Amino acid sequence: MIEDMREEPVLIEKEDRFGWDYTFDSSTAVNTIMYSNETTILFDETVSKLVIEFRAQLPYSTYLEDLIGNETNEVRYVDVKLWQPGTRDISSPFWEARATQDYPLERFTFGKSDFILGEWDLVVEARGYGITAPVDQLSFHDHFEVYATITKPCIRFPEIDDVGECTFVSDLKS
């Protein structure tokens, strides 16, 4: 009788997001800052979609290149790579982007047929400036955002899950 009163579980597609939003901040104009980070994303058989979002803002990049040079693009850059399982350092990345000037927000979408099961590595290496000058108009901060979002089926149990919460189907199989 009590079982009949229980609401049915609801299957939803839920996004799981990985990545970074970073703003460079240094004390002087002559110091660049290095930033690197990486994270592992588990692709199991339930992942149905991958969306990568990337944007870089490198203010005054063309003017500074003329002033101090950046022929090899080593002074200010954002380099992002997504590696499939077991391919890092022995093959080309699944996806990559490199910005040495402003890079408008771009979304890259991949479907299930593009995926190999296992642990994927999202890696970023960047170098930039972040200057707060006494005069606001002379201040600038390099900035980038990169996110990889996977979509997986998730079950919401109304009796135990709060709104927006659910359990990934792949976690129920373990």
What kind of feature is each model-predicted range?
Residues 10-26, 42, 53, 110:
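Structured alpha/beta or helical-core interaction and ligand-binding surfaces enriched in interleaved
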Residues 32-36, 103-109, 147:
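Extracytoplasmic/lumenal soluble domains of exported proteins with redox or metal-associated functions
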Residues 16-34, 96-101:
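Extracellular beta-rich ligand/substrate-recognition surface
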Residues 78-84, 88-116:
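Beta-sandwich interaction modules
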Residues 28-94:
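Acidic, Ser/Thr/Pro-rich low-complexity intrinsically disordered segments
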Residues 5-14, 70-72, 80, 84, ...:
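C-terminal edge strands of extracellular/lumenal beta-sandwich accessory domains
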